[in-house]
């Protein structure tokens, strides 16, 4: 039966190659990716809401609920069991994994990612994990695109495009935001915008959004009604809000990396579970709005609250009934949200940073405007408007994606009347954070390793190249105790003009250049007088097998060498890299990468 299925697929692939042009088939695949991704997003949302409603239906809104101490630990524990014994692979940092797949795995994402992130994030968020469902569904969508392309034997350049289609469809489907889905793919995943890539991305995003509209209706995700039109006199305050959001984004990014670094140093999953679960439980117990994605709090702030309604933000907390402490309460939430999100993922949970970014931005915008109004600055700042703008500001800063921030918030809320201030806030936030952090929270790990694909063509091509593909191993090795006569025999057996010198353990200790011994190599009376140890010189530099190609090229530029030896972490000789080999490989990647 399996053979029949395989042969049927093979027959279809052969038929497709004869009857359907490549570009047209890519459009068909992008349409399918949009449909599958939209349904994956809908399934994820339904499961999360069902779990949350089941667990919190009988909560008393007027007093602290001690179940907050239990639920997050249970969620992280169940997620950890699922990942460890069912998935048996790391599925955290979804967007970072997509970036890595594009730059180092030729767009190939493991098959289990088409479903594993849905289950893991549903458990984590449903039980109160303080993270978002969007990054897991983006990874799911990208995995759907990658594996669909793999099934039909598409080349890796097309796989990378289908990965982008999956991401665009995921954002469009879960947020009902097709433009934001397209822009996210271009800004965050850094898929190049060409005519051959634009149409598939659009088809996938529009298809996913349409499916969401059909199933859940055409209403925006958040209800927002503009009570006061934007006035130009508020532009200085909008710029200040953008700078404030940039600083909040910087705090969130650096604190997140620091806390996750602490969890990374814990070697056993049980220590991570205990530390993460305890931290998250205590934080949610003290600040219940940290429970789950936080969209209920966003809804409250965007709807606008009277003084009498402020207590609703503090439901189930010890602050309930003290509306005069709202500002302090929200500032504490801004400070502790990053610890709640880090504890969720670091402890073994699965979730993304879309929702935390939106959540922090909404609260930051509200706090900024509410504080300004309290001290009676010259212009009144509509708090719900600034809460909306804050969402765009923090998202733009955390993701280093100002256009995504603008279009996503506009489509999420229908707040198109605030398009100008949304742009101002997003740009101000982005310009603020890049002064301190050149890479987004998703890309900084890959950028440090030289594994990040960017819109910079030269760096992008170097990123797509791999060290193992340019290392040449047909060099004859010699040893320091060999005499000149033995060296001449080695030279006669080689077509190279450089000879690595290694000890008995294979450690590189030097090189012999043919040009350096040319004047004595034919004088037989000197064959027993000189040894390789006396004739060898140090290599201009050493390359390591873990070096990125950008580091390799920088070393060649610094040394002006034509050949450089490659060693491992223990300095054992592996081979040589030559400029000619690099240039040939560079040219091959350039031609393939630039085809349109």
Q: Which residues make up each language-model segment?
A:
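ATP/adenylate-binding site constellation spanning eukaryotic-like Ser/Thr protein kinases
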Residues: 204, 425, 472, 514, ...
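Short beta-to-alpha loop/turn elements within the nucleotide-binding domains of ABC transporters
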Residues: 465, 482, 512, 530, ...
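Structural signal for short hydrophobic segments within the conserved structured cores
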Residues: 474-478, 534, 539-542
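The conserved cystathionine-beta-synthase
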Residues: 478-495, 501-502, 521-524, 542-569, ...
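Short beta-strands and strand-coil junctions in structured, solvent-facing domains, enriched
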Residues: 508, 562-563, 573
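Short hydrophobic beta-strand motif reused across regulatory alpha/beta modules
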Residues: 510-517, 575-582
């Amino acid at each position: 039966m399996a053979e029949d299925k395989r042969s049927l697929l093979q027959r279809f692939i052969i038929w497709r190659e004869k009857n359907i042009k490549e570009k047209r088939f890519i459009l068909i695949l992008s349409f399918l990716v949009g449909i599958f991704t939209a349904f994956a997003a809908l399934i994820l949302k339904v499961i999360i809401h069902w779990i949350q409603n089941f667990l919190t239906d009988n909560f008393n809104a007027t007093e602290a609920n001690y179940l907050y101490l239990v639920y997050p630990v249970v969620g992280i524990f169940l997620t950890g069991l699922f990942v460890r014994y069912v998935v048996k692979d790391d599925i955290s940092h979804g967007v970072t994994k997509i970036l890595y797949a594009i730059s180092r795995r030729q767009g190939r994402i493991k098959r289990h990612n088409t479903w594993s992130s849905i289950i893991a994030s549903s458990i984590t968020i449903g039980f109160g994990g303080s993270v978002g469902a969007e990054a897991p569904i983006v990874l799911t969508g990208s995995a759907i695109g990658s594996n669909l392309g793999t099934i039909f034997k598409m080349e890796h350049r097309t796989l990378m495009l289908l990965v982008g289609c999956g991401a665009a469809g995921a954002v469009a489907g879960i947020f009902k935001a097709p433009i934001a889905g397209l822009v996210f793919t271009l800004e965050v995943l850094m898929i190049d915008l060409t005519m051959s890539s634009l149409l598939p991305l659009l088809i996938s995003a529009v298809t996913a959004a349409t499916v969401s509209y059909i199933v859940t209706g055409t209403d925006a995700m958040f209800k927002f009604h503009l009570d006061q039109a934007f006035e130009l006199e508020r532009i200085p305050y909008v710029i200040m809000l953008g700078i404030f959001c940039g600083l909040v984004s910087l705090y969130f990014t650096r604190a997140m990396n620091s806390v996750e670094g602490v969890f990374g140093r814990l070697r056993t999953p049980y220590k991570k579970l205990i530390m993460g679960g305890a931290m998250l439980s205590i934080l949610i117990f003290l600040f219940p709005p940290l429970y789950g994605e936080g969209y209920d709090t966003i809804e409250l702030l965007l709807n606008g609250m009277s003084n009498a309604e402020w207590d609703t933000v503090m439901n189930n907390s010890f602050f309930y009934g003290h509306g005069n402490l709202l500002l302090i309460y929200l500032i504490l939430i801004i400070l502790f949200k990053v610890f709640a999100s880090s504890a969720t993922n670091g402890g073994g949970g699965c979730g993304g940073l879309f929702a935390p970014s939106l959540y922090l931005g909404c609260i930051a915008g509200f706090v900024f405007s509410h504080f300004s109004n309290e001290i009676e600055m010259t212009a009144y700042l509509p708090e719900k408007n600034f809460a909306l703008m804050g969402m765009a500001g923090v998202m733009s800063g955390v993701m280093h994606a100002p256009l995504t921030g603008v279009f996503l918030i506009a489509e999420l809320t229908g707040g198109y009347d605030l398009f100008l201030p949304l742009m101002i806030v997003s740009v101000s936030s982005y310009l603020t954070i890049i002064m301190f952090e050149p890479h987004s929270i998703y890309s900084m790990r890959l950028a440090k390793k030289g594994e990040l694909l960017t819109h910079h063509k030269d760096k992008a091509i170097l990123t797509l190249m791999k060290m193992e593909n340019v290392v040449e191993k047909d060099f004859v090795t010699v040893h320091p105790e060999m005499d000149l006569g033995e060296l001449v025999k080695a030279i006669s057996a080689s077509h190279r003009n450089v000879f690595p010198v290694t000890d008995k353990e294979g450690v590189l200790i030097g090189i012999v250049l043919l040009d350096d011994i040319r004047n004595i190599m034919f004088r037989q009376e000197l064959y027993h007088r000189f040894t390789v140890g006396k004739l060898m010189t140090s290599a201009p530099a050493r390359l390591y097998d873990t070096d990125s190609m950008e580091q390799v090229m920088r070393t060649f530029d610094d040394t002006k060498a034509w050949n450089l030896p490659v060693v491992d972490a223990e300095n054992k000789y592996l081979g040589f890299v030559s400029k000619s080999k690099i240039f040939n490989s560079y040219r091959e990647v350039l031609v393939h990468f630039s085809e349109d």
